[in-house]
Regions:
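Conserved HGGG/HGGXW glycine-rich cap/lid loop of the alpha/beta-hydrolase fold
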Residues: 6-53
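Conserved alpha/beta-hydrolase catalytic His-Asp/Glu region
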Residues: 116-118, 132-190
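Conserved loop-alpha-helix segment in the C-terminal half of the alpha/beta-hydrolase fold
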Residues: 192-239
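Flexible "cap/lid" loop of the alpha/beta hydrolase fold
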Residues: 92-97, 101-133
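Conserved catalytic-core motifs of eukaryotic protein kinase domains, centered on the activation segment
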Residues: 26-28, 51-57, 117-118, 208
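Active-site loop/oxyanion-hole signature of alpha/beta-hydrolase fold enzymes
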Residues: 32, 41-86, 97, 236, ...
């Protein structure tokens, strides 16, 4: 069973799923805010945080199965499942494959890699030696934050990402490319619950990450609008890839408003 925190009480339950190279503590501000009113489960995915990694944690679907197993073991009623980045992919997988576990979905700065960028990711498993993983992780995380964000927190999160086992790191990054190319559109079409896309960045065709401005769309948001039957979109501006960390107050307010609309 994957490691997790279990805090608070109240319905609906909120299940938080972190990004690649991260852990459950990225959601500390959300757990602190929501746990007086909601049961909050924040997981460490396989190979991240306190959860031991296996070879099959190189596949996105394995992480979805792990979270499903945890939710079933806790006998949770249908929950609001909230993911960031890789966690968005896991969240989509859970909602599409095991719909009875999901009351709603919140995608925090998700993305779908373009065919060219997916190809780059898909080649990582073959082209990136595990001994180069730490440099790869540092280069990735250097682009994930807004310019004014706390440099000590940036350093802390970057160093944490380098602690993922190198072979798992390069293999999982490669599998994100496969998942986006082969699975995402079909899975999105299978979601039948309300979805909030809480978006702060977009990836340009050259693979660079940029902050969004109000009312700006992106290929990923366009895809969600095409495939998801019940979609709301909220933009957090001047922010990097982790709005729950950089802008927790705004993130909490957007989640709170979405929950209120569900009720």
């Amino acid at each position: 069973m994957i490691e997790h925190s279990d805090t608070g009480d109240g319905a609906p339950t909120l299940v938080f799923i972190h990004a690649f190279g991260c852990d459950h503590s990225d959601w500390d501000a959300q757990v602190a805010y929501f746990s007086p009113r909601h049961r909050c489960i924040a997981v460490d995915l396989g190979g991240h945080g306190a959860t031991w990694g296996r070879d099959d944690h190189a596949r996105v679907e394995t992480h979805g199965s792990d979270v499903v197993a945890l939710m079933k073991s806790l006998d949770l009623p249908p929950a609001i499942v909230i993911g960031n980045s890789l966690g968005c992919r896991v969240t989509i997988d859970i909602s599409a494959r095991v719909p009875e576990l999901t009351r709603a979905v919140i995608l925090v700065d998700g993305s779908r890699l373009s065919p060219s960028t997916s190809g780059i990711h898909a080649a990582l498993g073959a082209d990136s030696a595990p001994e180069g993983y730490q440099d790869l992780a540092r280069a990735m995380f250097a682009k994930m934050f807004s310019p004014g964000f706390d440099p000590e927190k940036v350093a802390e999160m970057t160093e944490r990402a380098t602690q993922v086992a190198p072979q798992l790191g390069v293999s999982l990054l490669a599998d994100i490319g496969r998942h986006d190319l082969e699975e995402m559109e079909r899975l999105l079409e299978d979601i039948r619950v309300p979805v909030l896309a809480l978006q702060s960045t977009y990836i340009s065709p050259d693979g660079r990450r940029h902050s969004l401005v109000h009312d700006q769309s992106s290929p990923y948001l366009d895809l969600l609008q095409e495939k998801v039957c019940d979609l709301s979109i909220e933009i957090i501006t001047n922010c990097g890839h982790y709005p729950q960390v950089e802008y927790p107050t705004e993130t909490n307010a957007a989640i709170d408003a979405f929950i209120a609309r569900l009720n």
